[in-house]
From Swiss-Prot:
It catalyses: trans-4-hydroxy-L-proline = cis-4-hydroxy-D-proline. PANTHER family: TRANS-3-HYDROXY-L-PROLINE DEHYDRATASE. InterPro entries: Pro_racemase_fam (IPR008794). One of its GO terms (molecular function) is 4-hydroxyproline epimerase activity. Signal peptide: none annotated. Keywords: Isomerase, Plasmid. Substrate binds at G86, H87, H205, D231, G236, T237. Catalyzes the epimerization of trans-4-hydroxy-L-proline (t4LHyp) to cis-4-hydroxy-D-proline (c4DHyp). Is likely involved in a degradation pathway that converts t4LHyp to alpha-ketoglutarate. Displays no proline racemase activity. This is 4-hydroxyproline 2-epimerase. It comes from the Bacteria.
Length: 313
């Protein structure tokens, strides 16, 4: 299996160039569902140790339906197939440039949740124009074991998020374990209370926000992912959901740019324009760097060919 690895603000992306499962034709949403239904062993073996690493997201290249798109892509982590991935789209774009498949300029990429526009400014810098993002619930309160009542918004930016501001725990690198435990407890309570999207879509991400000590930065975030890891980047789909909340509250004007910081200090530049359906069209600028190009082997006599699972699944 031929892969290229990159990181976007510290968050790794593995682009699968060849050797992945054949998913047939049809809409990318159907092919993504087929990947989730029939090929869980594939994406877990690619993402889990010893081949993968915590927080890595995979990007399986597929043929797009729309001929104007440079490629189709299905994102996944070790736990689930994702509708969209912002840091992964930045990493994918830089990877395609590294391969010589695209040059600086604007391109379209097809994802299971819609077509995303990317603008490659230089070898490492990409601006994404994401799908329309929206807030669907404001100030929903849940009782969380160990924390009491916690209030958050439910918003969609390509994935579903429960957004808590301010964070119940200071967002510092030294608090990552405590932040993760808190986010897991909150997500468990959110699911137990039946809180989800408009049609009951499950919340699989939790984001905490707080003010940043850096004067040029709007806020600092901690993003808890479906597989129990945390996002090293500010999270593209999470930032999109955040923009929808800020716009709905009247706290950020259309076209106004802010800087969003992750728990490790990496940043995105964010802005939005009004969307046609009452949401926002986010713009996210970040940087990615290619780290490795390699061939993955899956020998039948390897006891860990399907990855190392540290907890029962």
């Amino acid at each position: 299996m031929h892969v290229i690895d990159s990181h976007t603000g510290g968050e790794p992306t593995r682009v699968i160039l060849s050797g992945g499962p054949h998913l047939g034709s049809g809409p990318l949403s159907e092919r993504a569902a087929r990947l989730a239904r029939e090929s869980r062993a594939f994406y877990r073996s690619v993402m889990l140790e010893p081949r993968g690493q915590p927080a890595m997201v995979g990007a399986l290249l597929v043929e797009p339906v729309d001929p104007d798109c440079i490629t189709g892509v299905i994102f996944f982590d070790a736990e689930a197939v994702l509708g969209m991935c912002g840091h992964g789209t930045i990493g994918l774009t830089v990877t395609l440039a590294h391969m010589g498949r695209i040059r600086a300029g604007t391109h379209k990429i097809e994802t299971p949740v819609g077509i995303v526009e990317v603008c490659l400014s230089d070898a490492n810098t990409v601006t994404i124009t994401n799908i329309e993002s929206r807030r669907v619930h404001r100030a929903r309160q849940v009782d969380v074991d160990g924390f009491g009542p916690v209030t958050g918004d439910v918003a969609y930016g390509g994935n579903w998020f429960f957004i808590v501001d301010p964070s119940p725990i200071p967002i510092e690198r030294t608090n990552i374990r405590a932040l993760s435990d808190a986010a897991l407890a909150i997500r468990t309570a959110v699911i137990a209370n039946g809180i989800g999207g408009e049609e009951g879509q499950p919340i699989d991400h939790v984001i905490f926000y707080e003010m940043s000590p850096r004067s040029a930065v709007h806020s600092r975030s901690f993003v808890f992912c479906p597989d129990g890891t945390y996002d090293r980047s500010p999270c593209g789909t999470g930032s999109s959901a955040r923009l929808a909340c800020l716009a709905a509250e009247g706290l950020l004007n259309a076209g106004e740019e802010i800087i969003q910081e992750s728990v490790i200090g990496s940043t995105y530049r964010l802005s939005y324009q009004p969307g046609p359906n009452g949401g926002v069209i986010p713009k996210i600028t970040g940087q990615a760097h290619v780290m490795a190009e390699s061939t993955l082997h899956f020998h039948t006599d390897d006891p860990y060919r399907n990855g190392i699972c540290h907890a029962p699944q």
